[in-house]
Curated annotation (Swiss-Prot):
<keyword id="KW-0949">S-adenosyl-L-methionine</keyword>
<keyword id="KW-0808">Transferase</keyword>
<comment type="similarity">
    <text>Belongs to the methyltransferase superfamily. RsmH family.</text>
</comment>
<protein>
    <recommendedName>
        <fullName>Ribosomal RNA small subunit methyltransferase H</fullName>
        <ecNumber>2.1.1.199</ecNumber>
    </recommendedName>
</protein>
<dbReference type="InterPro" id="IPR023397">
    <property type="entry name" value="SAM-dep_MeTrfase_MraW_recog"/>
</dbReference>
<feature type="binding site">
    <location>
        <position position="84"/>
    </location>
    <ligand>
        <name>S-adenosyl-L-methionine</name>
    </ligand>
</feature>
<feature type="binding site">
    <location>
        <position position="113"/>
    </location>
    <ligand>
        <name>S-adenosyl-L-methionine</name>
    </ligand>
</feature>
<dbReference type="Pfam" id="PF01795">
    <property type="entry name" value="Methyltransf_5"/>
</dbReference>
<feature type="binding site">
    <location>
        <begin position="40"/>
        <end position="42"/>
    </location>
    <ligand>
        <name>S-adenosyl-L-methionine</name>
    </ligand>
</feature>
<feature type="binding site">
    <location>
        <position position="60"/>
    </location>
    <ligand>
        <name>S-adenosyl-L-methionine</name>
    </ligand>
</feature>
<keyword id="KW-0698">rRNA processing</keyword>
<keyword id="KW-0963">Cytoplasm</keyword>
<dbReference type="GO" id="GO:0005737">
    <property type="term" value="C:cytoplasm"/>
</dbReference>
<dbReference type="GO" id="GO:0071424">
    <property type="term" value="F:rRNA (cytosine-N4-)-methyltransferase activity"/>
</dbReference>
<feature type="binding site">
    <location>
        <position position="106"/>
    </location>
    <ligand>
        <name>S-adenosyl-L-methionine</name>
    </ligand>
</feature>
<dbReference type="GO" id="GO:0070475">
    <property type="term" value="P:rRNA base methylation"/>
</dbReference>
<comment type="function">
    <text>Specifically methylates the N4 position of cytidine in position 1402 (C1402) of 16S rRNA.</text>
</comment>
Length: 321
């Protein structure tokens, strides 16, 4: 094991480290996928539990995560620069479809991404309005906000941020950029500008939450197609897993968690059988594909105290039947 494979660093504390990896029920010779490498906390811990015959494929779309992954000098490990929705293509390329013993996902934005002002994820640090997890492709938040309509932005803020003042905020943003065109002034281009504009548009302030919190979340989710990515992975994950292969998924907001919970529940229940059929229960084939493992797990008080950003995390685990 390379000496660099520590489980955390000064800049990033891995959330639910032991719980998420334990959820995989690691086999020492198994083949695993870390779909969200980040800064490598989960990957390094998985590697520490595998034998020389084990294998770990890590995936991330953030170029900085890829650079961090290249520090791991381990023949059992490989990194793929891609989003986790492309795990099926990666498995197909490596001839691993149906052979994966576990897939781990740690959804959302990482602490380093939040802390690096130039990434544009945080309203707490002034930086360019970017918000892309993969800075090599796609529209930045600034570029998208220049062209979006009030109606479309309202929908995004409501759908992905559950923002009650979505119409007010959307109107303020679109009007600001329209005014910039008319008066030849600068468009919204900084996180601090956007946060201040949102704050002014919101009539009532929550004592415990910055008024820009939900809007920043919504714009980030839209820019990165986060829920589409998750839905795509969930729809294909079962075909990637070997029998008894595990899904271990950490989510950080209710939209993600509802998707994961609904998927696992549906696949563990199997197909609905029309009522009234002349069949006994033992004759019904429901085609169940997953078994839910335990209850949802949240961080301990000690973990939350050590890492307040872990507060909203929730882990769900299921096993392929």
């Amino acid at each position: 094991m390379n000496s660099e494979n520590s489980f955390s660093s000064s800049e990033h504390i891995t959330v639910l480290l032991h719980e998420a990896v334990n959820g995989l029920a690691l086999k020492e010779n198994g083949i695993y996928i870390d779909g969200t490498f980040g800064r490598g906390g989960h990957s390094r811990f998985i590697l520490s539990q595998l034998s020389s015959n084990g294998r770990l494929i890590a995936v991330d779309r953030d170029p900085r995560a890829i650079a961090e992954a290249h520090k791991i000098q381990d023949l059992r490990f490989q990194i793929e620069h891609n989003s986790f929705s492309h795990i099926p293509e990666i498995c197909d390329k490596l001839n691993l479809v149906g052979k994966i013993d576990g897939i781990l996902l740690d959804l959302g934005v990482s602490s380093p991404q939040l802390d690096e002002a130039e990434r544009g994820f945080s309203f707490m640090k002034d930086g360019p309005l970017d918000m892309r997890m993969d800075t090599t492709q796609g529209l930045s938040a600034e570029e998208w906000l220049k062209q979006v309509s009030i109606e479309d932005l309202t929908w995004v803020l409501k759908t992905f941020g559950e923002e009650r003042f979505a119409k007010r905020i959307a109107t303020a943003i679109v009007d600001f950029n329209k005014s910039a065109v008319k008066n030849s002034t600068e468009f919204l281009s900084r996180t601090s500008q956007l946060a201040e504009l949102i704050s002014q548009a919101v009539p009532f302030k929550d004592k415990h939450k910055h008024p820009a919190t939900r809007s920043f979340q919504a714009i980030r989710i839209f820019i990165n197609s986060e829920l589409d990515e998750l839905e795509s992975l969930l729809n294909s994950a079962l075909d990637m897993l070997a029998p008894e292969g595990r899904l271990s998924i950490i989510s950080f907001h209710s939209l993600e968690d509802r998707m994961v919970k609904h998927f696992m529940k549906k696949q563990s229940k199997g197909e609905d059988i029309p009522k009234g059929l002349p069949l006994r229960e033992d004759q019904i084939q429901r085609n169940q594909k997953l078994r839910i493992i335990g209850k949802a797990i949240q961080p301990s008080d000690a973990e939350i105290q050590a890492n307040p950003r872990s507060r909203s995390a929730i882990l769900r685990v299921a096993e392929r039947i």
